[in-house]
Amino acid sequence: MLVVGEASGDAHGAQFVDALHKRDAGLTIYGVAGEQLKRTQFEALFSVAKLTGMGLVELVGNAGNVWRAYRLLKRTLEQRRPNLLVLIDFPDFNLRLAKHAKSLRIPVLYYVSPQIWAWRRGRVRQIARWVDHM
């Protein structure tokens, strides 16, 4: 399962998925996708467009979508039990998802890590606890 939260993550995710499919065309990869990931062999469970917003009004308006996406992805982790959870940036959302995956013993790879120095130093402890590879 792969989760992105913004356009730049979508571009990185699309390159990552393409590279994986070159190694193993039979892989099933699913999660949150933007337009670029949707053009790859990727099963989009939720659109990144519903998660993003630039201003306060958009963020407040998207709160319901963010909550729906989080619940959907938690259920997906529980039901489908992916071999790996791949996270790309979007730290406030993705670290919570990493914590849940870890409780299910699903390995977590943070492919594009959050910027620790710019935001919260306490994130280092969360990452150390919930992320297997970075």
What do the PLM-derived regions correspond to, one by one?
Residues M1-H133:
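Active-site and donor-binding regions of nucleotide-sugar-utilizing enzymes
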